[in-house]
Every structure is written in C-alpha cells, then in structure tokens.
C-alpha cells in the first residue's frame, strides 16, 4: 500500500488465531499493536483530533492537553507531530518509563501526577492546565463521543469483514476509556444478536463489577471509575483478573505464540482462560492485543528472572 502520511496507515489490523495457549478452543486476537503508533489508541487519537478540527474546537497553532495512562498519549503525540500541534500529556507517575520516552520522542511534553491519585488525579491536573493555557483543547477521551464512534466506523467493520460468515460468539476485552468495548459491542450485537461481550478489569480495582477502586499494575485498564464512554448495558458480564496472572499470560503468549504483548493484553488472555470452561463447545472467542510488550520491559515482574 501507499500512504500520503503515517496517519493513513491507522486501522485495518489483523485477526490472529491463538494456536497453543487454549488447546481445543477457537480464540482470535485482534492485533492492535499493528497500528503505526503501536496501540489501539491510535484510532481514537486521530478521530478525536479530526472531530475537534471539524467543530472548530481545535484551531491551527493550538495546544492539546490530555490526561492519559500512556497509549492515548503516544497516539496523540504521533498525530500532533504530523498536524503541527503542541501537546502536553498528564499521567500518573506509575506509568512505564518506555511510554514516557516514546512521547518525548514524538515531541510531546508531559506532567506527572502522584500514583496514588490514579487517573482521577491526572484528569484534575489536566483541567487545571487547560484553564492556564491559551488556545488549549482537551480531548477528554473518557467521554468524547468520537472515541466510541471510531470503533463503530472502523474496528467493528474490520471484525465484520473478517468474520461475517463465521460469527464471533464471545468478545472478552479490557476497559480503559470504554470506547472500544462500547463501540464494538453495540455495533456487532446488531449483526450478531447472540453475541456475548465481557469486560475485563483488575481484581484489585473491580469498579465495573460494583467494587471499590484501588491501585494495580495493569496499565491501560481499570481507571478506577466508570467512564461515560462505557455503556454498561451493552455488557453481559465482568471478569476480574489478578495482575500476577495477567503478567504470566503476557509472558506465555510471547514464548508460545511469538506475540509480545502488554500487561493489559495479558489480562485479556487471562480472562479468556478463566471464562473458557463456562462457554459452550465450539464457541468462537475474540480478544484484543492493545499494544506491544516493548512498552513494559522495565515494569517489575513483567519479564522472567531468567
């Protein structure tokens, strides 16, 4: 393919069958690490910026300020670099060093907030910066409708294109902003009425399941609150995952399937492993690989000791 800019290569990511981790089961993973910025968040970064340009909220020479746990920030940094915007990213200090360095490589500036305040603290700080900065615009990924819409227009259609004649029975996927699980669930359930969709969240912060927020090391999911973009009525259940098991599954899929994935993708694989015994024989399951494991090599216990 030929592209006029790197942004034209966002989307159309492959679906890869897992061969060894789940013997006797048909499990597919949508490889969002194949996006040019390396994660599923490239989709929403471009969509939110283009929507703001169209509405006039973001003007040439403007500044983008966003609270992010990392991957949205990297996607925004890539898009901002192409389009010529200044970008300030706000995130908890617990986010991995690799993510921060990637943002810097794209030319973004960032502001770190206390880890114990989680994403709530990052959002509060970002709102302060918007008030202090002329020409600032905040995408607000947790509530921006362009977030859900891009998954309706692109992600869902890609799944339909590949599985129209062999429908997916169960989708199991994590919740960060809520955009992709909402967009995919609401769109695909219209095509496949029997489709079941399960959200994955950290056992240590089971907010969607009705529990209390808490600190956890599964970066990218489990924000500690229910985002406006998460339409819980589209879900058929929640699967809670232990962080140690998520890291173990991330290591296993690298060594057994050759897929180097992040911790949140490991959490999805752990949730699939947990749910498979409850599913009917022959169920076709789809999960997501949100980003690459290269972003977590410095995270404690992500790599085996030897």
Where does each model-flagged region fall?
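PLP-dependent amino-acid enzyme catalytic core
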Residues: 1-306
């Amino acid at each position: 393919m030929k592209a006029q800019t790197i942004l034209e290569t966002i989307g159309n990511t492959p679906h890869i069958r897992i061969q060894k981790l789940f013997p006797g089961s048909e499990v597919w993973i949508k490889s969002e690490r194949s996006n040019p910025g390396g994660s599923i968040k490239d989709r929403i970064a471009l969509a939110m910026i283009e929507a703001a340009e169209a509405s006039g909220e973001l003007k040439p020479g403007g500044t983008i300020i966003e609270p992010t746990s990392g991957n949205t920030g990297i996607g925004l940094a890539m898009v901002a670099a192409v389009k010529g915007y200044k970008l300030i990213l706000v995130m908890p200090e617990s986010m991995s060093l690799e993510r921060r360095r990637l943002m810097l490589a794209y030319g973004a500036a960032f502001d770190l907030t206390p880890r114990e305040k989680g994403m709530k603290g990052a959002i509060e700080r970002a709102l302060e910066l918007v008030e202090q900065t002329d020409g600032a615009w905040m995408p607000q990924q947790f509530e921006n409708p362009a977030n859900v819409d891009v998954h309706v227009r692109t992600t869902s259609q890609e799944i339909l294109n590949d599985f129209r004649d062999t429908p997916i029975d169960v989708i199991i996927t994590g919740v960060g902003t809520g955009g992709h699980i909402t967009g995919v669930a609401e769109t695909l359930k219209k095509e496949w009425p029997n489709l079941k969709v399960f959200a994955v969240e950290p056992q240590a912060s089971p907010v969607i399941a009705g529990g209390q927020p808490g600190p956890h090391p599964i970066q990218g999911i489990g924000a500690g609150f229910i985002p406006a973009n998460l339409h819980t009525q589209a879900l058929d259940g929640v699967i809670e995952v232990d962080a140690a098991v998520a890291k173990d599954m991330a290591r296993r899929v690298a060594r057994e399937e050759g897929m180097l994935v992040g911790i949140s993708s490991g959490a999805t694989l752990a949730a699939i492993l947990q749910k498979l015994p409850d599913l009917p024989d022959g169920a076709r399951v789809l999960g997501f690989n949100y980003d690459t494991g290269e972003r977590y090599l410095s995270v404690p216990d992500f790599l085996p000791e030897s």
